[in-house]
Amino acid sequence: MVGIIDEVQLFYPLGTRIKIGDNYGTVRYVGEVSGHMGSWLGIEWDDGLRGKHNGIVDGKRYFQTQTPTGGSFIRPGKVGPCATLEDAARERYLNYDSSNVDESLIREAQASLQASLFEVVGMDKIARKQSKFEQLEEVSVDQTPVNAAGYLKELTHLTTLNVSHTLIWNWEIVASIAQQLPSLTNLNLSSNRLVLPTSSQITELEPSFRQLKRINLRSCGFSDWKDVMHTALLWPNILSLGLQENSLGQLAEVDRTKIFKQLHELDLHRTNIMDFDQVTKLGNLTTLRLLNIMENGIEEIKLPDCDSQEKLNIFVSLEQLNLLHNPIWNEADAFNELDKLPQLKRLSKTPHLKSNFDEMFSKAVASIASLQFINKAEVTAEQRRGAEYDIWKKYALDWMQATQGGTDSLREFCRRHRTYPLLVKKYGSPADFVPRSQAKQSNLINVSIRHQLTGETWEKKVPRMITVQTLQGLVMKRFRLSGDVPQLCYVDALHPDLVVPLDNNAKTLDFYSVQEHDTVLVQ
């Protein structure tokens, strides 16, 4: 019995991955179970509800699981067969089983018969397929029982490899794959549970990964950022790292003399990082251009303080930030904080429940001076001018009160509205606008509606709460327009150089701050 158990232990080292049906698990124990004959494998299932216990049977602990019902004992014979990456790739891309044809025997037969034209049926077809196999640039063997490399040196053109959801369970296996593929730059290891490498293993294996530029470790069971940083010592030249769906929770500052020296992209989607203070710990990643922190439950964006006319010396290269599906409760404050980032050009964010995309777009554009795209929508010069002008008018009274309240009052205003001093430089002092905003407003306003093509002008008294869509209907009727609905914009009577598009048909003139004697242009 001891010999049999030793053989099982040799075949299933602790940490080995197994698959039964659609269920994946990790070997946590190999040996006897009291009261039961033979050798057993103690399995911790990826699905924490799949098992029957937590590693304790009849009061004795054999192994430990993360969930109360994550463990089971199974017979070794229940575990299905494994495969090499070589065999899995050939089967998927050639539909060819090498055991059916012994190519060396065929070549011997050709030589012995001295028949240069000797041909075995199907051999030419296999040769053509083999040629295509060698030229493959991308290979995916996801959802296969791969747990070893095999012979891969023929794949000299391979740049992208997907071995997600396989049975690869340690970095020695990954290294034996990578070292045979000199052109490999993109590696997807998602949904594999890999044993943490030792320091000596990292020293030994690191040369095998020097060509790697992009690696995806989605749902690989990481729960400690320190383990990520330790493992990252394997990839000295990594540019893009995916850690989606690993429950990290907390982060720590990175030692850039050792890891992430060239990192451009980091994906922390759904990693349970609920506090933005944790995100700022990565601010010393000076080469980072893209950061994805969507679906993390972040409610507030808070960055270190800096003067309103300055930018922070963190995330100095960050151009793209993904905040989608985080319950950020104060959009205006969040955008004001993000203006502190020196290079932010692209932002993705879900509108607040009490907001909509157009309102969010306007706030973001006016509050983040460097922003060029939001949710993939490009910010045009006209849209920026309109958004900035709305903010310029909205806080005109607050600005005037702050300037009259002394240095501290003005500093506090600029802290809460970082871009406002820039808007004053751009559009002038809002002092002459303040009396208009303070005065008791009539429900009706007189506006001049001018057709730009014909020059015809229509003086009209309209309700402040009239929608753009209703006004478009009146304009079409008055100017006898047919065909496409005309585009409208307005010019502030006191600042005729500012042209603001009325680009949301559902909004009112009051929303756009159209005032008495302003001009509406029909385009």
UniProtKB/Swiss-Prot annotation:
**Segments annotated as LRR repeats:** 155-180, 181-204, 209-232, 235-258, 260-284, 285-310, 315-337
Q: Where in the cell is it found?
A: Cytoplasm
The record's note on what follows loss of this gene reads: Embryonic lethal, with a few escapers that develop to first-instar larvae. In larval muscles the microtubule (MT) network is greatly reduced with a decrease in the number and length of MT fibers. RNAi-mediated knockdown in larval neurons and muscles results in a significant increase in roll-over time. RNAi-mediated knockdown in pre- and post-synaptic neurons results in increased branching number, increased bouton number and decreased bouton size at the neuromuscular junction (NMJ) synaptic terminals.
Which pairs of positions does the record mark as disulfide bonds?
A: none
InterPro entries in the cross-refs: CAP-Gly_dom_sf, CAP-Gly_domain, LRR_dom_sf, SDS22/Internalin_LRR, Ubiquitin-like_domsf, Ubl_TBCE
Q: Name one GO biological process term.
A: neuromuscular synaptic transmission
A molecular function GO annotation: alpha-tubulin binding
UniProt domain CAP-Gly: residue ranges? 31-75
Superkingdom: Eukaryota
**Keyword Transmembrane helix assigned:** no
Q: Identify the main location.
A: cytoplasm
What's this chain's function? Tubulin-folding protein which is required for the development of the neuronal microtubule network. Essential for the development and function of neuromuscular synapses. Likely to promote microtubule formation by acting in the negative regulation of the microtubule-severing protein spas.
Instruction: State the similarity comment.
Output: Belongs to the TBCE family.
Give the protein name, as stated in the record.
Tubulin-specific chaperone E
- Which species is listed as the source? Drosophila melanogaster
Q: What is the lineage of its organism?
A: Eukaryota, Metazoa, Ecdysozoa, Arthropoda, Hexapoda
